[in-house]
Amino acid sequence: MAGNSIGQFFRVTTFGESHGIALGCIIDGVPPGIPITEADIQLDLDRRRPGTSRYTTQRRELDQVRILSGVFEGVTTGTSIGLMIENTDQRSQDYSAIKDVFRPGHADYTYEQKYGVRDYRGGGRSSARETAMRVAAGAIAKKYLAQKFGVQVRGYLAQMGDVSCDLLDWDLVEQNPFFCPDASKLEPLDALMRELKKAGDSIGAKITVVAENVPVGLGEPVFDRLDADLAHALMSINAVKGVEIGDGFAVVTKRGSENRDEITPQGFQSNHAGGILGGISSGQPVVAHIALKPTSSIMVPGQTINRQGEAVEIVTRGRHDPCVGIRAVPIAEAMMAIVLMDHLLRQRAQCGDVASDVPRW
């Protein structure tokens, strides 16, 4: 089956292309009675949308969301929620030069080989434009998680190129265009972006997402473990080439005596596991990291082929992000929220009556 949906109890199906008429999604499984407005959803969409700073693509989409169904008098009805965002700033002529050429590092070649046809305008369905609907659906999940369980899902830029950012100030994340929590790194990040723009090149990034106050018990061993579903969801984001849960690949150099999260009557003493043990949430913060590749849509000439298999030189023109990782923060938050909400509903369905005498913190 086509891979346009995610989730079992909280199910999100998206549709639309980069230069199509509109983007949309259908959300099934939303409990009734949740207060939700277009303004609630718009808050996260505005964090993701293009053209909001000089560091991102200058495609200027308002990304104004419309609720088509599933909400009446300001609350969810329990029926399918339909959301739509119209595309308003397409410049398809920017892509006419690549109609018969395959951009290296993009999905052009693989989409052509899989489907026998491709929408070359901005990448069509493979464009990160599609993620606007994930953010919209994630905004609903985030509101439910916060209202019902006090769960807070937040993300930040952990690294761009050689510039690493320490988590020093959550409030600062929303006060700069990089989603950076480290004030001392704002100037180096700005310098790096100016250098990239001048060179017509791009850079990769690392994003960290943290969910706090996640209840114990979420996750369905063995194939739908919470970390497995999180990895699946986060890996589905455009340009993501790696996912880590907790300490991730750093555990390779650790010994069991230092990596285990020891438990005392006061609680866990560390969180190397990233809040997930045996595929089930432990009650600690759920922590995930994603690595995003540098976009291949750059002004630096490169080698590729055309439809006839002939060697050609390519320079990608148009409006593109020097670092796609900047706008990935709200997208990663949305995907974590979608997975957590799905698993909360699944846990309630099967194990909602389970009570344990073992302490939880």
From Swiss-Prot:
EC number: 4.2.3.5
Enzyme class: lyase
Entry keywords, A to Z: Amino-acid biosynthesis, Aromatic amino acid biosynthesis, FAD, Flavoprotein, FMN, Lyase, NADP
GO cellular component: cytosol
Pathway participation: Metabolic intermediate biosynthesis; chorismate biosynthesis; chorismate from D-erythrose 4-phosphate and phosphoenolpyruvate: step 7/7
GO biological processes: amino acid biosynthetic process; aromatic amino acid family biosynthetic process; chorismate biosynthetic process
Cofactor: record remark: Reduced FMN (FMNH(2)).
Cofactors, names only: FMNH2
Record-listed FMN binding positions: R125, S126, S127, N238, A239, G278, K293, P294, T295, S296, S297, R319
Chemical reaction(s) catalysed: 5-O-(1-carboxyvinyl)-3-phosphoshikimate = chorismate + phosphate
GO MF terms held by the record: chorismate synthase activity; FMN binding
Binding site for NADP(+): R48, R54
Similarity annotation: Belongs to the chorismate synthase family.
Known partners and oligomeric status: Homotetramer.
Role: This reaction introduces a second double bond into the aromatic ring system.
Record-given protein name: Chorismate synthase
Species: Yersinia pseudotuberculosis serotype IB (strain PB1/+)
